[in-house]
């Protein structure tokens, strides 16, 4: 007889903030399918006793934080890490970039059946802060917040207010997850849910045929052509106060490319030398060596990562006397030839692909329809489904993870686990979707060359207040792939990528603030965009003090200490940046880290190199969050 499906719970800890006394002072859990079954208590031992007997699936929002307390407890209570599912051991999925996905605690076996409780990260399924989930999903949310710095000795009695907040937090996640599960979205991450939904539509059989599993060797070559979004500040405006201007962004930029552009499928054919046109294999990735100089009046589009000679986040005006070695999709190569003069070009080899349009049509039609005809939770889920798919195609097959252990000082440390690989999904798709995204943004920006201030992935910022001719026929607030006129500003100042301020024209309509224009506004909204800056620090920013070197000691930094994790205030400084940098698509995750603004210092070197686009990677790029864990390369880690 098949046993009952496992129960699922939403859980949360409240913890002390002292390095020398780091512990859980409150826990809460709530049954995701029956909100009347919940408990809030003040002892981690009591919580863990429940965990060990409940044999359920638990969800914490931001497992990296709460999970650190759990593993501290397990290590101190006779449990050892093991990948083999032995009794009284626990296993983890923690990527080498320090992304936490799972803790699986094994108590033993009943016959063949494993007796275990598994803990997941709801943040991977709903990549937003709890308050934003409550807003977007139209769930009730308690006003106010817990006072995190209040003295709370061991055995502290939870106040009625605190009790209410904890209950509210676990209930929001419980409600949101229940809606997801009811939609059949039961995978470990939003990206996996999205890929599963896509496979359901085109069928697994067709998926395998259209997107064959490439060898790790081929995948590695294709991946060299994978890049993130185009994020570039025009030197002409750097650090200067600018007058009126406007911002446009593409509605659902990546889904729009997936909907209409020519995209690769099938097994590639390897070729030597230069690609020769082949109507059966119209797309290609070319390995070239060359020197290059930017043409007069053109935006730079080439960025070289992992090189000794070039800054990884700068768009280059010249190869600077070195011979550049590049792997480029034909989309990027054509753009490069249009923007640069190339010298001493050597075409080495490449891969060519069959291509088609419309593979994603049914999937995007389905979820776009749901998005436009729903509100609240279902609308948000539809957005998540649409925006999480492209990143999955380029998931990194190297899933070597981290293994936790207790260090001499009693805090958690992490060592690299054994090398581990999984099958790639279909990286060429990721390469071309992101390439078409860059192409769309860069061609629009180039057509407005005399006005372009800044680009970020799917947006262009221009001087002046007239809609440029080049996009005037494709401006629309909602249509897929059209440019939305996002805002008009009175003045602005840009320091580097993802670091700018604007005074935006707003008008009050029936009590709400909506976008205004120079001839029609009632309010000016001061907007601060600055990767890694907390809301508290943003309140300190003015047009006068917003410059390179601006610094405040107010940024919470997460540190592993005996017992768990504490947040300590560290210094946040605006550093002088290059004129460009790869960052990636929207992915909701950005917003989450925007909201959290937490750096993790976990010993080891000073943080990894940065990879190409892939949902997660690029948003780390975007956030400039340093997770100091001393290993290179960004990874996308997905098991189930």
Each predicted region: which residue ranges?
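Conserved acidic
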Residues: 1-7, 19-591
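Histidine-centered metal-binding segments
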Residues: 628-640
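Ser/Thr-glycine-rich phosphate-binding loops at phosphate-binding pockets of nucleotides
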Residues: 12-19
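Thr-biased low-complexity repeat/linker tracts and other Thr-enriched repetitive architectures
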Residues: 579, 583, 587-602, 606, ...
